[in-house]
A protein has these predicted regions:
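A cytosolic small-molecule/anion-sensing beta-strand core signal
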Residues: 40, 60, 128, 197-199
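A short, polar/charged loop-to-alpha-helix boundary motif
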Residues: 165-167, 212-221
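Short, flexible loop/turn elements at secondary-structure junctions
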Residues: 26, 40, 179-183, 195
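Short, low-complexity export/processing leader segments characterized by acidic and small residues
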Residues: 135, 153-158, 194-204, 208, ...
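Acidic/glycine-rich beta-solenoid
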Residues: 1-121, 142, 157-173
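A motif-centric feature for acidic-aromatic and gly/ser/thr-rich catalytic loops and repeats
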Residues: 7-12, 93, 117-192, 226, ...
Length: 239
């Protein structure tokens, strides 16, 4: 039994750590089905859920540089990534730019947001894992408040209950748990090298590295941070 997900099943003896099935709870926020295509470097390339589709593009170093999100062949969002501190979104409302100040996606304390000719600075309040808990405008007004369980599942800050599918408010920065990008339309978090399901508390693909040969948890290649999410952060999906 896993929190608000339901009962997990492990029925493949050749892959004892791989989840083969799930009996979800009545209000489980886990997505029922995702089709994912990977690159030769095992990075997620195409993610499909029903009529929703995201196409991810990488550079020669396997760093994500663009995401195109569409719905029934209708482009809804194109997002560009530059370095580790700049993002540009193009959608039906125009062009939105985000430049992180004093750091990158995972540790910056402020962000300069620009839409058209209007620029605004917002201050990012994080917890010790780097998760975005609050965002304040230049006048100190709280414009966003977030809460996450230990595994990164989004919760209502007032009730501490997990949001049901489609009920979570849009993230101002598109990022939340440990500073990573939430792909709310697919119910996963993009941790760069791999996709992570915060409801299951597991990665969707195995870790290509074993970091600690003398620690049993390191051999569960689907686990997140050796099953110690309050102690460690996986910044790139591999280490």
């Amino acid at each position: 039994q896993k929190g608000n997900a339901g009962e997990l099943m492990y029925t493949n003896p050749n892959h004892p750590y791989a989840v083969t099935g799930l009996t979800p709870l009545a209000e489980s926020p886990v997505k029922s089905h995702l089709d994912i295509v990977y690159t030769a470097a095992e990075r997620p390339s195409i993610i499909t859920h029903g009529i929703q589709k995201a196409v991810l593009t990488y550079n020669a170093n396997h760093d994500r540089i663009r995401m195109q999100y569409s719905d029934n062949s209708r482009n809804l969002l194109t997002r560009y990534y530059l370095g580790d501190n700049y993002e540009l979104d193009v959608d039906s409302t125009g062009v939105h730019e985000r430049l992180y100040l004093g750091g990158g996606y995972y540790d910056a304390s402020a962000v300069l947001m620009k839409k058209g000719d209007i620029s605004s600075v917002y201050f990012i309040h994080r917890d010790y894992l780097g998760s975005v808990l609050q965002i304040a405008d230049a006048q100190g007004n709280i414009v966003e408040e977030n809460n996450f369980d230990a595994w990164g599942c989004r919760r209502n800050p007032s009730t501490l209950k997990a949001y049901t599918i489609g009920a979570a408010p849009k993230l101002l920065l598109g990022r939340g748990y440990t500073g990573h990008e939430h792909l709310e339309m697919f119910g996963v978090i993009n941790m760069n090298a791999r996709l992570y399901d915060p409801v299951l508390g597991r990665f969707l693909t195995p870790d290509p590295y074993v970091q600690m040969l003398d620690f049993t948890q390191a051999f569960n290649r689907y686990s997140y941070c050796m099953n110690s999410p309050l102690c460690y952060v996986d910044e790139n999906g591999e280490f």
